[in-house]
Amino acid sequence: MEKLSILTERQQTELNYAIIQYLQPLCQQDNHALLDQLSKILNIDQWTQESNNVEKVDNYLEKRWSTVLRLQKKIIDLENEISNLNNIINSSNSDNNGIVLSKDKINWIPKGTAKQSYQCENIVTTVKLHPNLPLVLNGCNDGNLYIWNISNDDNTIPEKMIKAHTRAINKICFTYKKPYYLATCSSDLTIKIWDEKFNHIRTLNGHEHTVSSIQFSPIDNSILYSVSRDKNIRVWDIFQGISLKSFVGHSEWCRDLDIVSSDNNGDFVLTCSNDQSARLSHASSGAGLAMIVGHGHVVETVKFLPALQANKILDEYITKNIEQFPTIPLELLKDKTYNQLGFKYCITASRDNTIKLWLIPPPKIAPHRPPLPSKYNNSQSWMIAELRGHSSWVKCLCVHPNGRFIISGSDDKTIKFWDLSSLLETGSVNVVKTIIGHDGFINDIDFARLKEASDSTPTSQEDLLKEVEKRMRCLFISGSADNSIKLWN
């Protein structure tokens, strides 16, 4: 019985030619008779001549074989990805705290297995996902800037490596609007600006000590903010290359900052320091508007909480437990000034191993004048909750795009995901996921920025959540003192 072939007649002919082509250079002079015999078996009588029907390609069999291997690897990768996605769908996404997470994309958190890992020669000090492209950037303590392409099969070789600074790179940030300029700051006292193709275009000098952190204005690509060990907060025009303003915000080393923009009142700067405090300042005037005091050690990082979900959850929690907050006027929670400002709550992380959540008193807003310190609580912020779970310094924070989850990285080598909504159920912000994968301190984390906004402007929270879900990029990275960057699945 004749065996059925899975190949077409043309494919069979191409395969036969490829076999002869592969064997020809391997055969010695005295083996040519054997090769002739094999050619007849394969119905290739003139294997040394070009065929009119079959296109002859050099090293055809080897190329086909390597293609099969690549496809097999790709299939395995896709099967693993499907398995991980199925696990996410089938899992209830619950922890020992009994908090059940939604299976919707809006509440996506990584399962805890690294999809890819990138290894550097030195300690990774900072990481950042590109706002638009599939690129991971990281800075190291030797001053090198690495750029990795997520879509590359080979994750051992960076897309690009730049000797950006002479000492450690402490922070990387991108502009919020196209074109996406990049800024890096360093312990060499400088800030460097890079274009979209990562060409160096300008160096900003002015700080007298380590530049700890930087961030662009959300509404103006030309404006960059920086904080330093020299205690100064500086405002830069990156195109002119000049410092527009400098003011002292703290009595000791300024560690980190976060920026929020208001349509009518410009930018507001939230900073933290070795003096164990955080401070809200008005960028244009440099005026201090509110203080955050309550940590027992260096405050490493600060973040504004977005209004999406967080405001509603925290307002409800305070209202239901107002007896715990006797100095917070209930009418303050409904103060419309917050709508003008673009901020209400913030979080801080410290070397005292805790994360604290704060209600910021609103500054006084007057027409044609810069904002003034708040009339409430002597301009002191109210601590709403304390997040305990890390066993060592909490070094980095980021906020999930949905505004509900807080993500923290610590010197205890763990990354934790905290659910604000658990406040309403248990009275505390509980951990819903702990990721363990690094062998060293977690120095930085980053959740991918949302895709570019559409022209529509959602108004209700439900519509806002749908818009965020549509624009979400489910990518999360971490950088560690173990010299690695991990992209989490």
From Swiss-Prot:
UniProt entry keywords in alphabetical sequence: Cell cycle, Cell division, Coiled coil, Cytoplasm, Cytoskeleton, Microtubule, Mitosis, Repeat, Transport, WD repeat
A Pfam match: WD40
Entry function: Positively regulates the activity of the minus-end directed microtubule motor protein dynein. Plays a central role in positioning the mitotic spindle at the bud neck during cell division. Targets cytoplasmic dynein to microtubule plus ends, thereby promoting dynein-mediated microtubule sliding along the bud cortex and consequently the movement of the mitotic spindle to the bud neck.
Name of the protein: Nuclear distribution protein PAC1
UniProt xrefs under SUPFAM superfamilies: Lissencephaly-1 protein (Lis-1, PAF-AH alpha) N-terminal domain (SSF109925), WD40 repeat-like (SSF50978)
Subunit architecture: Self-associates. Interacts with NDL1 and dynein.
Subcellular location: Cytoplasm, Cytoskeleton; Cytoplasm, Cytoskeleton, Spindle pole
Coiled coil (residue ranges): 66-98
WD repeat segments: 119-158, 164-205, 206-246, 249-291, 328-368, 389-428, 437-486
Transmembrane segments: none
Superkingdom of this protein's organism: Eukaryota
GO biological process, one term: establishment of mitotic spindle orientation
GO cellular component term, pick one: spindle pole
InterPro entries the UniProt entry points to: Dynein_regulator_LIS1 (IPR017252), G-protein_beta_WD-40_rep (IPR020472), LIS1_N (IPR037190), WD40/YVTN_repeat-like_dom_sf (IPR015943), WD40_repeat_CS (IPR019775), WD40_repeat_dom_sf (IPR036322), WD40_rpt (IPR001680), WD_LIS1/nudF_dynein_reg (IPR050349)
SMART domains found in the cross-reference section: WD40
